[in-house]
């Protein structure tokens, strides 16, 4: 009798562990995506900031915002020139991603490197149903900004 009870408890424990691992794998976005990744579904994520897919700035921080349907997991990736892939951005061990709630908004901030920064934002219901948006941000150096200010000053003076 005791062996039968122990067997039931063991089977229940294994079932709970299996269900938890299935749930976790459905909600986890991949850490690395190939540069050629394409959307499998439309309109799961819409980039709001930056407003253009190619932009320039002299700021070292970039706010990112997007809209997505409730329940979509939004993740942000940075292109790694050494690997040729997009890697999920993390701060410490915490990935820049979130499941969108009833506000249907996602917001985050990334640090920019000098020169060209390539990003990808991914909105996914599951591993097979996702949309991606790629965008580039070029960080201009101070010397370049000073030259532009000088040209503008000369034009208007």
Per-segment meaning from a language model:
Residues 2-12, 26-157:
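Ser/Thr-rich low-complexity repeats and stalk/linker segments
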């Amino acid at each position: 009798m005791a062996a039968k009870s122990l067997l039931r408890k063991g089977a229940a424990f294994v079932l709970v562990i299996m269900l938890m691992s299935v749930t976790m794998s459905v909600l986890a976005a991949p850490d690395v995506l190939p540069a050629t990744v394409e959307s499998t579904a439309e309109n799961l994520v819409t980039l709001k900031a930056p407003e253009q897919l190619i932009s320039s700035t002299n700021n070292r921080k970039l706010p990112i915002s997007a809209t997505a349907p409730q329940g979509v997991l939004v993740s942000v990736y940075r292109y790694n020139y050494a690997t040729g892939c997009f890697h999920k951005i993390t701060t410490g061990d915490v990935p820049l991603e979130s499941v969108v709630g009833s506000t249907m908004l996602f917001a985050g901030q990334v640090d920019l490197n000098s020169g060209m920064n390539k990003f990808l934002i991914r909105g996914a219901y599951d591993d097979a149903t996702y949309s991606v948006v790629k965008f580039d941000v070029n960080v201009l150096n101070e010397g370049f900004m000073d030259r532009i200010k000088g040209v503008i000053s000369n034009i208007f003076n």
